[in-house]
């Protein structure tokens, strides 16, 4: 579908609310024997999802790839003993600080460690990347992101969000994300609105370019 193509993934599931989607997705992806490794300054939806996890979790210093690797070493040692899977979670663009996550560097760690990477790109979708496809597109590492979350509440100016991944993962999430199974889906009017906004983004980068023009003007004015 259009969203999957836009973020360069195989399939996509629409979600009724972004916060609930991230929390519920984390819950669905891991069980109590699995290990989570996550950035210390992750959004509340990630932190709450991690807190619900009944297994081991290791936190790394914000955007510190060296510390992330240290935690991966700990996680992999435990995984070897228990057969656990490892899920690494970070953000594409951190909303509270305004800095990009070290997504490309974390993807590179896959050459040494066996883990899946979940990226919350709520602030990157529509604003970063040559075509607005997000932080992974901006950093040239979209293929290395296993589970990609984007929201409709920022650049789309709507409600809801989506999760994109391999078709097998998305199919699993459709039947295991409790926030989607036991709640109403997005109203069709909002879905149509999101598709229209996506059409505008795909047709022209002018809205994104205008955003960065205004952002850079503000930064220059504040510095001066």
Regions picked out by a protein language model, each given a short descriptive name:
Residues 1-17:
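Conserved N-terminal alpha-helix of the aminotransferase class I/II PLP-enzyme fold
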Residues 25-44:
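Conserved PLP-anchoring active-site segment centered on the Schiff-base-forming lysine
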Residues 32, 52-54, 144:
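Short, structured coil segments at secondary-structure junctions
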Residues 58, 62-119:
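Active-site phosphate-binding strand-loop segment of PLP-dependent enzymes
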Residues 101, 192-224:
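Conserved PLP-dependent catalytic core of the aminotransferase class-I/II
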Residues 137-172:
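Active-site PLP attachment segment
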Residues 159-160, 177-186:
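A short glycine-threonine-serine/GTX helix/turn-capping micro-motif
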